[in-house]
């Protein structure tokens, strides 16, 4: 078990020994404050894009539902006729090949898994680079008519000036012991919520609730809500369509009550496991670190029962299987091993759709109008599909 996994599990349990790291958290807090003030004072230079920038981020380490929210917002803006683009760090990709534009042919080991997912789901114009300014200029060079840029996970990237900030909070996970790294899993103090719109990612039955324990951290007018709606299971890999008919494997989606392997390499895998449990599956959880690069050996380890993964993990696993298909067909004169065929028949992905409260769309429209970005006056849809 590596140190990342050890500390992540300690955060989840709120282990007592974490308080021994408090002096490190104090130092981290001091450096973070000095850094932010340096940007405010102009000691460190920051970049002002020629068009408005909307930052979507969080103040915690790990997943909060940020990517589904971005997909939902992009789709909504596209439906309103607004020309929107997205930039991202491209975590997990090859920084030596960045800045890079992302398209439906991009692969996660080059541009990152989340950018691949966002573009595959929306077709949005997107660029990736650890240097957000370079990502921005690359994107605008190819798409000069964009009206709005969404910066994925750029909340702490103060070198990029922004016009709108939305912070996503997982209300079920909360803030743990409410301490900064490494004692807790906060990137910034909870007071940071006061300066932005805060989207509370909640369970579906609490979407309209206003009674949550974090309400004192930001004004009521800035509190927004969303939840993730699971969709029908989809085949992750279909040999008859993805390997030129070299093999045909038919499979039925696992039924409620059946045992499944839940394999996840996301920031907060427990949410995924809980969702499958709520859907009625008997879940065998297999958590991996965020942005994990799965191997065929790891997947073959989970035998007998169906394997269900998230959309984000499916991006990498699909690329892995495509490469393995090429390797096997080249080596064995266009035949695939029985073991590989059997694995493909058991792989499923659980897509989710972000369902936003009406307040999200109302606030968004107000913010866009303030920035002189025209938006359709037609009635907003709460569920974006």
UniProtKB/Swiss-Prot annotation:
Pathway: Glycolipid biosynthesis; lipid IV(A) biosynthesis; lipid IV(A) from (3R)-3-hydroxytetradecanoyl-[acyl-carrier-protein] and UDP-N-acetyl-alpha-D-glucosamine: step 6/6
Disulfide bond listed as a keyword: no
SUPFAM superfamilies given in the database record: P-loop containing nucleoside triphosphate hydrolases
InterPro entries: LpxK (IPR003758), P-loop_NTPase (IPR027417)
Domain of life of the native organism: Bacteria
Enzyme class: transferase
Record field: catalytic activity: a lipid A disaccharide + ATP = a lipid IVA + ADP + H(+)
Pfam families in alphabetical order: LpxK
GO biological process terms, semicolon-separated: lipid A biosynthetic process; lipopolysaccharide core region biosynthetic process
CC terms in the record's Gene Ontology section: plasma membrane
Transmembrane keyword on record: no
Enzyme Commission no: 2.7.1.130
Binding site for ATP: 60-67
Keyword field: ATP-binding, Kinase, Lipid A biosynthesis, Lipid biosynthesis, Lipid metabolism, Nucleotide-binding, Transferase
One MF term in the entry's GO annotations: tetraacyldisaccharide 4'-kinase activity
Family per similarity comment: Belongs to the LpxK family.
General function of this protein: Transfers the gamma-phosphate of ATP to the 4'-position of a tetraacyldisaccharide 1-phosphate intermediate (termed DS-1-P) to form tetraacyldisaccharide 1,4'-bis-phosphate (lipid IVA).
PANTHER family given in the database record: TETRAACYLDISACCHARIDE 4'-KINASE (PTHR42724), TETRAACYLDISACCHARIDE 4'-KINASE, MITOCHONDRIAL-RELATED (PTHR42724:SF1)
This protein's name: Tetraacyldisaccharide 4'-kinase
Originating species: Psychrobacter arcticus (strain DSM 17307 / VKM B-2377 / 273-4)
Gene: lpxK
């Amino acid at each position: 078990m590596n140190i990342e996994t050890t500390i992540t599990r300690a955060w989840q349990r709120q282990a007592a020994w974490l308080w021994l790291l408090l002096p490190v958290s104090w130092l981290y807090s001091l450096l973070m404050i000095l850094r932010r003030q340096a940007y405010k004072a102009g000691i460190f230079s920051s970049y002002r894009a020629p068009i408005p920038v909307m930052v979507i981020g969080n103040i915690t380490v790990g997943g909060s539902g940020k990517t589904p929210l971005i997909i939902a917002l992009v789709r909504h803006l596209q439906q309103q006729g607004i020309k929107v683009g997205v930039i991202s760090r491209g975590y997990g990709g090859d920084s030596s090949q960045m800045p890079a534009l992302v398209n439906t042919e991009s692969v996660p080991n080059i541009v990152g898994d989340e950018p691949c997912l966002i573009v595959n789901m929306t077709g949005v114009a997107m660029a990736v680079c650890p240097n957000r300014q370079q990502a921005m200029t690359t994107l605008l060079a190819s798409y000069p008519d964009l009206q709005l840029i969404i910066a994925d996970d750029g909340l702490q990237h103060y070198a990029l000036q922004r016009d709108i900030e939305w912070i996503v909070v997982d209300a079920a996970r909360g803030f743990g012991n409410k301490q900064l790294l490494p004692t807790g899993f906060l990137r910034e103090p909870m007071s940071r919520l006061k300066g932005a719109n805060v989207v509370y990612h909640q369970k579906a039955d609490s979407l309209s609730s206003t009674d949550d324990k974090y309400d004192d951290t930001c004004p009521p007018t800035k509190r927004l809500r969303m939840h993730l709606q699971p969709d029908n299971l989809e085949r992750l890999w279909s040999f008859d369509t993805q390997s030129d008919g070299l093999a045909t494997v038919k499979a039925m989606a696992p039924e409620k009550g059946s045992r499944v392997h839940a394999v996840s390499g996301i920031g907060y895998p427990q949410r995924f496991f809980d969702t499958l449990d709520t859907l009625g599956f008997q879940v065998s959880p297999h958590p991996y670190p965020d942005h994990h690069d799965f191997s065929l050996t790891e997947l073959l380890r989970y035998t007998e029962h169906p394997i269900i993964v998230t959309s984000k993990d499916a991006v990498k696993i699909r690329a892995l299987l495509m490469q393995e298909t090429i390797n096997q067909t080249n080596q064995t004169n266009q035949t695939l091993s029985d073991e590989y065929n059997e694995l493909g028949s058991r792989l499923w992905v659980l897509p989710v759709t972000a369902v936003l409260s009406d307040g999200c769309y109302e606030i968004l429209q107000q913010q866009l109008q303030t920035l002189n970005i025209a938006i359709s006056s037609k009635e907003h849809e709460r569920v974006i599909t």
